[in-house]
Structure formats: C-alpha cells, structure tokens
Amino acid sequence: MKIRNSLKSAKVRDKDCRVVRRHGKVYVINKKNPRMKARQG
C-alpha cells in the first residue's frame, strides 16, 4: 500500500479504483488489482 499526499493521481490509475473513508482515513481500493491500494496521509 502506498501512502500519498494526494489520492487524485492514485484514483485515475485504473478504472476500477474506488475512494473510501475508513476510521477517518481516506483509501483508494481496487478489488481487481490490489497493487493499486493507497492511503492518504
């Protein structure tokens, strides 16, 4: 999982990427390609 300042670039890397909020943190998840996971921080 990558830790990024901005998730905009992480979101557009793949069309299956989703932005979700969990426990006050923002994540990009991708069920089809888990290598695309990222967290904002």
From Swiss-Prot:
What's one Pfam family here?
A: Ribosomal_L36
> Example GO biological process term?
translation
Keyword field contains Endoplasmic reticulum: no
Please indicate which superkingdom the organism of origin belongs to.
Bacteria
Q: What cellular component GO annotations does this protein have?
A: ribonucleoprotein complex; ribosome
Q: Name one GO molecular function term.
A: structural constituent of ribosome
Which keywords does the record carry?
Ribonucleoprotein, Ribosomal protein
Matching NCBIfam families, A to Z? Answer: PRK00831.1, rpmJ_bact
**HAMAP family per the record?**
Ribosomal_bL36
Q: Which family does it belong to?
A: Belongs to the bacterial ribosomal protein bL36 family.
Q: Which PANTHER family match?
A: 50S RIBOSOMAL PROTEIN L36 2, LARGE RIBOSOMAL SUBUNIT PROTEIN BL36B
Report the protein name in the record.
Large ribosomal subunit protein bL36
